Amino acid sequence: MKTLHRCIGVALLALGALAGTAHADRIKDLTTIAGVRENALIGYGLVVGLDGSGDQTTQTPFTIQSFNNMLSQFGINVPSGASIQLKNTAAVVVTASLPAFVRPGQTIDVTVSSIGNAKSLRGGTLLLTPLKGVDGQLYALAQGNVVIGGAGASANGSKVQINQLGAGRIANGATVERTVQATVGEAGSIQLDTGTTDFGTVQNIVNAINKQFGADTAEAADGRTVNVRAPALAADRVGFVAKLQNIEVTPAQAAARVVVNARTGSVVMNQQVKLEPCAVAHGNLSVTISTEPVVSQPAPFSQGQTVAGARSNIEVKQQGGSLINVKGGTNLADVVKAINAIGANPQDLISILQAMKAANALRADLEII
């Protein structure tokens, strides 16, 4: 019961502030511009300088192969069949996001993740690694010291670890070598994407833009896209977009929605959720399995052997649930109070909410993630 109160209470605290009057947001907070996006980059490399926490090369042969290929580029040939133990080396995957409008010579952050069985990347240095896009072209070169946010220690079979040791970041660790051309407004229009389908919000955006720049400047393409006429000169588009994104718009009221995380039992709902009066019967089923060690001791001088075994007891309990009258609610506080009155834990609440939705008692979209 306390867990449910805490879970629903968080939702109430997070969304209770929305119960007031309608507020205005900037267009830049409600939309994104088509063509202005990041592009994913990926590369494969080696991290060296680890203090004995690298890959066990007998189990990760690709680390040895990569190491030999690197040495061959410097004119060093490793004899075939040589047994090399690289405890200070780890094979890694390097990922990064290439921002829009970035230029060659500028730097971006990279994430370094172990793909072998290295215990830790702390203190390691990433060797020069090419980062490529999905088209196979090289866009950046990464290299630098890996910063790990975790820590760990082990001795005599005991181990303590804080956070993750197999992945880290290198701030400004990659230098951009090639750019991705981003076109904004070159076709005479700019597309604004709201990210979600909401005809009311789209229409409010159109009205606000036309009020600022004049009639027919913007028009709705569909329930999530707005087309805006852009200046013909590229030099004028930057200032135009800056003014465009700072226009304040009042979003339309969102659809009533309840989101449930089936893995953690978290429940979040917005202020539009309404609950019709209904009756709920909730029962609990518990299964308890207990195992006790049993030792069979032979009689003296019987030449028998002592045998150890186990005895398991299985107990099933089912508690009948009484019918609870759930009062309807027209605001978020009433809905939270009514759901808490059921007394179910968060996992059981998922089934109850599904049943309420099927009975048309829950006036909201139910989404389980």
Curated annotation (Swiss-Prot):
Task: Give the record's keywords alphabetically.
Answer: Bacterial flagellum, Periplasm, Plasmid, Signal
At the top level, the lineage of the source is Bacteria
Principal location class: periplasm
Question: Please, one GO biological process term?
Answer: bacterial-type flagellum-dependent cell motility
Q: Where in the cell is it found?
A: Periplasm; Bacterial flagellum basal body
Q: Which GO terms describe its cellular component?
A: bacterial-type flagellum basal body, distal rod, P ring; outer membrane-bounded periplasmic space
Does the record carry Isomerase as a key word?
no
Query: What span is annotated as the signal peptide, if there is one?
Result: 1-24
Report if keyword Signal is assigned: yes
GO function terms (MF aspect): structural molecule activity
One Pfam annotation reads: FlgI
HAMAP family in alphabetical order: FlgI
Cite the record's note on assembly.
The basal body constitutes a major portion of the flagellar organelle and consists of four rings (L,P,S, and M) mounted on a central rod.
Q: What does this protein do?
A: Assembles around the rod to form the L-ring and probably protects the motor/basal body from shearing forces during rotation.
Family from the record:
Belongs to the FlgI family.
What is the name listed in the Swiss-Prot or TrEMBL entry for this protein?
Flagellar P-ring protein
According to its UniProt entry, this protein's organism is Ralstonia nicotianae (strain ATCC BAA-1114 / GMI1000)
User: What gene is it encoded by?
Assistant: flgI
